[in-house]
A protein has these predicted regions:
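Catalytic cores of RNA-modifying enzymes
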Residues: 1-230, 263, 274, 283, ...
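An accessory alpha-helical subdomain
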Residues: 208, 212-214, 220-257, 265-268, ...
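Short, flexible active-site recognition loops that position polar ligands and cofactors
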Residues: 269-275
């Protein structure tokens, strides 16, 4: 069957039988993707080829795993739900290039897994791909970005509201603390919007697939990343307040000191966090540290 014909079959290769044994676990936030158009949009948007090692997060019953295995050099699928492990191994056995690992993506030593597979199979690129549980989307993305992985990109399905905030440009009304964190480490592009009926069971919200291409160097140069991100989080902690007031949540700074730092950074005290671009937050963090 051609890729195009696969895309036209909503349930092809999904592995989902609503009356079968592999029922989604509500406690794990499982909603299985069953829409072939969305599945192949993820595969194509990830730019997977035979020189690619794919790390798949939360493969479930393998709806995305099998198309990835067709296109990639190797797929390492990391699944938390023990019920899925053996059926997925059986389902992907014939591809000969899929390894299924039982583990928590927030706990596994991902860099070691990547290093081992790159060395053993001589692959050139690393793509992380996943349909992320809504309730831990941000922790997963931030772990992947902060760990210093050798991955080239992350392509992830997530709740549309979260995805729209991540994809927003820093310094715009839709931006939030997560916007700056993700854009600091990567460039972000939207692959496809996915409606709720594309899942089993259907969630209460729509989804979006984003691709985050990891930067070789950070978007801005900062002396202290941890403090830089603290400033951003403080700025957005009470996002309707002005920076002069919201930055008081940093602790340890008098209002006069914050005013002086804002002046030194060339930022008006009555501006809100959402109006600052990345460079302005970097200047502000440096000014506060020097205050």
């Amino acid at each position: 069957m051609s890729k195009q014909s696969k895309k036209s079959n909503k349930n092809h290769n999904s592995g989902i039988n609503p009356s079968g044994n592999l029922r989604p676990a509500k406690a794990l936030g499982q909603n299985f993707l069953i829409d072939e158009e969305a599945i192949w949009a993820i595969v194509d948007g990830s730019e997977v080829d035979k020189d690619t090692l794919v790390i798949e997060i939360g493969p479930g019953p393998g709806a995305l795993t099998c198309p990835l295995a067709e296109e990639a050099g190797r797929v390492v699928a990391i699944e938390l739900d023990e019920r899925m492990i053996e059926p997925l191994r059986v389902k992907t056995f014939s591809y000969g290039n899929v390894e299924v690992i039982h583990g928590d993506i927030l706990e596994v030593d991902l860099n070691s897994i990547i290093e081992k597979n790159l060395k053993e199979y001589g692959l050139k690129t690393v793509r992380i791909v996943g349909n992320l549980p809504y309730y831990i989307t941000t922790p997963i993305i931030m772990k992947l970005l902060e760990m210093g992985t050798t991955a080239n990109s992350i392509t992830a399905m997530m709740q549309k509201e979260v995805g729209d905030r991540i994809a927003a440009e820093p310094g715009t009304k839709l931006s939030g603390a997560i916007t700056y964190s993700v854009h600091y480490y990567s460039t972000v592009s939207k692959i496809i919007d996915v409606d709720r009926e594309s899942f089993y069971p259907a969630p209460k919200v729509d989804s979006v697939v984003l691709r985050m291409d990891i930067r070789d160097t950070a978007a801005v140069a900062v002396k202290d990343e941890a403090f830089f991100f603290r400033c951003i989080k403080a700025g957005f902690a009470q996002r309707r307040k002005t920076l002069l007031n919201s930055l008081m949540t940093l602790g340890g700074y008098e209002k006069d000191t914050i005013q002086a730092a804002l002046d030194a950074a060339g930022i008006a005290a009555n501006r809100r966090a959402e109006s600052l671009n990345m460079e302005e937050f970097a200047r502000l963090a440096e000014a506060l540290q020097g205050a």
